[in-house]
Structure formats: C-alpha cells, structure tokens
Curated annotation (Swiss-Prot):
InterPro entries: AceGlu_kinase-like_sf, Asp/Glu/Uridylate_kinase, G5K_ProB, Glu/AcGlu_kinase, Glu_5kinase, Glu_5kinase/COase_Synthase, Glutamate_5-kinase_CS, PUA. It comes from Hydrogenovibrio crunogenus (strain DSM 25203 / XCL-2). Pfam families: AA_kinase (PF00696), PUA (PF01472). This is Glutamate 5-kinase. Catalyzes the transfer of a phosphate group to glutamate to form L-glutamate 5-phosphate. PROSITE patterns: GLUTAMATE_5_KINASE, PUA. Belongs to the glutamate 5-kinase family. It is found in: Cytoplasm. CDD domains: AAK_G5K_ProB, PUA_G5K. ATP binds at residues 17, 176-177. It comes from the Bacteria. GO terms for cellular component: cytosol.
Amino acid sequence: MLTRSDIHQKSRRWVVKIGSALLTNDGRGLNKDAMAQWVSQMVTLRQQGIELVIVSSGSVAEGMQRLGWSQRPSELNELQAAAAVGQMGLVQAYESEFAKNGIHTAQILMTHDDLSNRARYLNASNTIQTLLEHGVVPVINENDTVVTDEIRFGDNDTLAALTANLVSADVLVILTDQNGLYNDNPRTNPNAELISEAQVSRKDIEAMASSEGGSLGKGGMYTKVMAAKRAARSGTATFIASGREDNVLPRLLAGEPLGTLLIPDLEPLTAKKRWLAGHLQAKGQLVLDEGAVKALQSSGKSLLPIGVKGMSGEFQRGEMVVCVNENNQEVARGLVNYPFFETQKIMGHPSSEINQLLGYSDGEFLIHCDNLVLAD
C-alpha cells in the first residue's frame, strides 16, 4: 500500500491529469505561460526518475479561441470541430516546451471503443510502455473528432484513471482548481474541512464529493473520486490536488501534505479483470436471485443460468453484462457465454437442461468466474 510518506521512494510511474481550467485563459485559448510552468514541474519529476504520462484537457478551449467562439458549444459536432482545431495547438505547446529540455512527446488519441477491444487495449498498453522505455512523454486525450455518445469516456478524469490501469501506474495525480476533497462543498460551506488522506474504499467519500463542475470542464469532484476508485483496481494511489499551488508536482513527490491522497486498500485486480471492470461497456443486465448473489460474493463461483430471474438489454456471446440483485444493486459484471435470446430461454433452468432447451450446449456456466468481476 502506497502512503504519502513513501511516495518518493516507491513510486516510479505517474499519470498526471491537468484540467482545462489550469491550462487556459478562462477558456480563451491556451495559457502558454501556465503550460510552460507545468512542463517545468514535470521535467523536475523526470529528473528524479519518474516516468510520466499526461492526460490533458484544453483542446476544446483552444479550438474555441481559434474559431472565435465565446461560449462552449453544446452540439456534439461543434465540440468535435473545436477539439480538432484545438488539439493542434495543445500538442504543439507541449512539444515545444518539452523540446526545450531535450524530451520528446507523443500524441495518443483514444476512445472507449479502443479499450473495449482486448487486442487494441493490449496494443495501446504495449505502445505506451515502449514510449516510456524510450524516454518519451505520452500526451493522451480523448479522440473527440470521431467519438460518439456511446463510446465516450465522458470526462478526462475517467480517461486518466483508465490510463493508470492501462500502464499500471503507481500514482495518479488529478489536478483541479480546488484544494482537494472536502467533507462538504467548500463553495457553499466555508467551514468545510479538507480530507488529507483516506482509503479509497471508505464508504462516505462519494457522499462528500461535490458533483458541481465548472463551465469549461465536464468533471466535478464526484468524477474525481470515482476515477480514484477505478485507478485503485491497478493498485494506483490517487492525489486530488490544486493546480494553483506553486510547484505542486515536485512537492507531492517530496511527500508534502497537499491535497487529498486516496489510498488503494484492496488487492489489485489481475490485468484481465482490470480490463473487464474498467474498459468494457455493458450491453445488458441480469437480475440474480439471492442464492446466486451469495454464491458470487462469498464463494467466488461462476454464474449458472438457474440463478437468473430477469434480464434486459441486447447482447451477443462474449459481451459485457451487469449482474444486479433484486433491489437493482450491482453485484458483478462479466462476459456472458450465451447471447440474449438464448439466455432468455435458459435462465431459471438447471445447466443440465441447456442442451435440451437450445439444441446444443456451450458449457454449464452463463458467466465463468474467470470472466467475472465483483462490484466494489
């Protein structure tokens, strides 16, 4: 378990997410002076042996400036156009600043669909690993130009967490315009107290997180806490800290008590189960009876058709489904062995009847335990 006191000694790979409010002139294009300061801090980390992956916002705000737009558009095609124009300036700014220190950068644009495909997921992981081995700093952003609502990450906090899983990062730093996670909303309660350190499984941290975001970005504090939970699947510790603090990254590395540190306190998932838990979009839902829920949660067993009481969605064999209890609470998710219409025929029946019901059998399990991940 990585704590604040041993961050310097034990962490070697960081994912740093920088929000649009910290990179732009209040939405009017990139703040080149601010970007130079961020790169300077990251160069300092590099000099202390830290491998860096950057997840950077700012392309839409830069595109708005270049196109002469004063308000963030709401239509997807206009957002995509702004992102396409602005991404050019964003990458140029990073490349220029890192080049002053003899460091190469690489642009990587991804969609959720890229990570949902196991082969492409592994290819992305291998590519980033190779870049890091060659001393290159990858700059990652969502591929807004081609993305649709169905394959969006939704915000760069989520993208940063999934990137941390992808590269098995030791530390995820989410930089924001707030000091960290408070026990209440500091914008409305002046007596709210900063949470310096907490275990990521702590039950009340989601309730503490404000869901209010700024006008330029999309992610509020709630998305940052959920990102920390996702990052914890790979054993990654998460800092949520203010980007307004001077020299914040080297100071976090030195162990200074800045921001909020959310510590992963559960056993990390295997690489395959991290992919299952974080990178696939659910195509359907199975409602389980009480016996099936207990079998999954207490015994780590596979899911049998007899334990399914209801279902919804439309899925094919091998696609992700969410398993819920009778109160609609998520229990697990996994890759289903039978498509929707066949699952509909065999649910509630013992596995010995599958061949009779379908005319063939592809195994006794609806979801094998190797392809199933329990809910946090």
